[in-house]
UniProtKB/Swiss-Prot annotation:
SUPFAM superfamilies: lambda repressor-like DNA-binding domains, Periplasmic binding protein-like I. The gene is rbsR. Residues 1-56 form the HTH lacI-type domain. PANTHER family: LACI-RELATED TRANSCRIPTIONAL REPRESSOR, RIBOSE OPERON REPRESSOR. Residues 4-23 bind DNA. The lineage of its organism: Bacteria, Bacillati, Bacillota, Bacilli, Bacillales. InterPro entries: HTH_LacI, LacI/GalR-like_sensor, Lambda_DNA-bd_dom_sf, Peripla_BP_I. This is Ribose operon repressor.
Length: 326
């Protein structure tokens, strides 16, 4: 493995000159800079980012923690954050916790060992002591914690829109899928739907769900139709759950939306490709990731911030799993 001394020798310059070039610290003649870059490419030399951050006392690494990379919603968040951070000269260290506390704690330790400048966390455990005890900033993404910086969407309004749409389509026996009880964002969605359903005085029942994962969604969909076979409308906590319900409804010979209406939440890219295409509530996932990165960098750079708890608007996307009644 090549070292900085090897690069200096190949470029015909001193180690100090290579170091100035790498750290953009001090004057380096353009011709010399070109020789150093060429030598680095020839020797396949890449500087150690952690060592550079320790030397400069300024890390350019950001930790990003997601709960489930198999859910297409979360890569959209990640891409938004990554694009904004890259634009500002930062790099991501990524962790996928699989909604497991042990893995999450291990990744937090990894971030610490790599001297990250801050963390963006779409965590299932925002109230962990580890977050409040960190000596670098944390921004929660698609999650909230009172008093902590966060970027989320208006889930309360979003699922009110979903409930209004499903009632407008004349469903009378509605099943509401409630997301994990310990996540405030999931409970905002639940409470928004609850308000509208009670006002409409329609029959409805609630199924509690422990996670947003694909595996759990499949078993939940089977439970739904086993427990409530007469259900003619489903409001899901996310598009993964809605897709599982759609699949199970079709498997049982139901016509969608004639026999049952289904509305998801997130508007993942695959939602419009399902058959029939899924009606859903669109979260601006890419923009949420981007805003989380902007917020974190603002905190790192000690910039004045107008707001640290950002809530972004959502929209109802009516496709073919809901009826359009006059």
């Amino acid at each position: 493995m090549a070292t900085i001394k090897d690069v200096a020798g190949a470029a015909g310059v001193s180690v100090a000159t290579v170091s100035r070039n790498l750290n953009d610290n001090g004057y380096v003649h353009e011709e010399t800079r070109t020789r150093v870059i060429a030598a680095m490419a020839k020797l396949n030399y890449y500087p150690n980012e952690v060592a550079r951050s320790l030397y400069k006392r300024e890390s350019r690494l950001i930790g990003l923690l997601l709960p489930d990379i198999t859910n297409p919603f979360f890569p959209q968040l990640a891409r938004g954050a990554e694009d904004e951070l890259n634009r500002e000269g930062y790099r991501l260290i990524f962790g996928n916790s699989d909604e497991e506390l042990k893995k999450e704690l291990e990744y937090l330790q990894t971030f610490k060992q790599n001297h990250v400048a801050g963390i963006i966390a779409a965590t299932n455990y925002p109230d962990l002591e580890e977050y409040s005890g960190m000596n670098y900033p944390v921004v929660f993404l698609d999650r909230t914690l009172e008093g902590a910086p966060s970027v989320s969407s208006d889930g309360y309004t979003g699922v009110k829109l979903a409930a209004q749409a499903i009632i407008h389509g004349k469903s009378q026996r509605i099943t509401l899928l409630r997301g994990p009880a310990h996540l405030p964002t999931a409970q905002d969605r639940f409470n928004g739907a609850l308000e509208i359903l009670k006002q409409a005085e329609v029959d409805f029942q609630v199924i509690e769900t422990a996670s947003f994962s694909i595996k759990d969604a499949q078993s939940m969909a089977k439970e739904l139709f086993a427990s409530y076979p007469a259900t003619d409308g489903v409001i899901a906590s996310n598009d993964i759950q809605a897709a599982a319900v759609l699949h199970e409804a079709l498997r049982r010979g139901k016509n969608v939306p004639e026999d049952i209406q289904i509305i998801g939440y997130d508007d993942i890219p695959q939602s419009g490709l399902l058959f029939p295409p899924l009606s859903t509530i669109k979260q601006p996932a890419y923009d949420m990731g981007k805003e989380a990165a902007k917020l974190l960098l603002g905190i790192i750079k000690k910039q004045p911030l107008a707001e640290t708890a950002i809530q972004m608007p959502v929209t109802y996307i009516g496709r073919k799993t809901t009826r359009k009644e006059d």
